[in-house]
Amino acid sequence: MIATEEQARAFVAERCDAAGMERIEALVAALRSENERQNLVSKGSLGEVWQRHIADSAQLLDHVSRETGLWLDLGSGAGFPGLVVAAMQPEKPVLLVESRRKRVEWLTDMVKALKLENCDVAGMRLELLEAREAGVISARAFAPLEKLLRLSARFSTDTTTWVLPKGRSAAQELQGVSRKWQKLFHVEQSVTSEEAAILVGRGRAKT
């Protein structure tokens, strides 16, 4: 379990090259600055930004093959996990979906500042996004699980990997969705908090 900011930084550094780490450092610096103007993340979490946001995002890569096609990040907000993934793995195509104007502006500015040619921002509600096949679907605090699965199912294929960070109620949330979805997922312990977990899934529910 990651217990300190130093451990969190080391965890991230082990999963990307030096250039990737420079991009993440730049992201953290920009986040600290911008958070004084808009509440991208809670002020209390900035003291543990590497644990709470960066490593928490980076750990999802451990559950995903590098050859997965498009990474679709729903409700990207401040950029977690999608922007972190794009910065750490610039060869991986990433699409950040976010409807809130100020968040869209922040994400667009960071994609440009970090020179992430692999990353695009869709500034719209997910319901309006044109259907496309996603190799990975991620979502952090986007919507209740049942709604999330219902809205995003049209982007999934038989080989799609789902990585959905959740809190202590992850297993309970999974029990609350239909059986056709339950059988695709299992619960993984988060490495950043004993009270957090990740719902990891594979494939698409059969209708």
UniProtKB/Swiss-Prot annotation:
Catalytic function, reaction form: guanosine(527) in 16S rRNA + S-adenosyl-L-methionine = N(7)-methylguanosine(527) in 16S rRNA + S-adenosyl-L-homocysteine
GO cellular component terms, semicolon-separated: cytosol
Binding, S-adenosyl-L-methionine: 75, 80, 126-127, 140
UniProt EC number: 2.1.1.170
Classification via InterPro entries: rRNA_ssu_MeTfrase_G, SAM-dependent_MTases_sf
Major location category of this protein: cytoplasm
Transmembrane parts of this sequence: none
Broad class of enzyme this protein falls into: transferase
Domain of life: Bacteria
Localisation per UniProt entry: Cytoplasm
PANTHER family in the cross-refs: S-ADENOSYL-L-METHIONINE-DEPENDENT METHYLTRANSFERASES SUPERFAMILY PROTEIN (PTHR31760:SF0)
Name of the protein in its database record: Ribosomal RNA small subunit methyltransferase G
Organism annotation: Erythrobacter litoralis (strain HTCC2594)
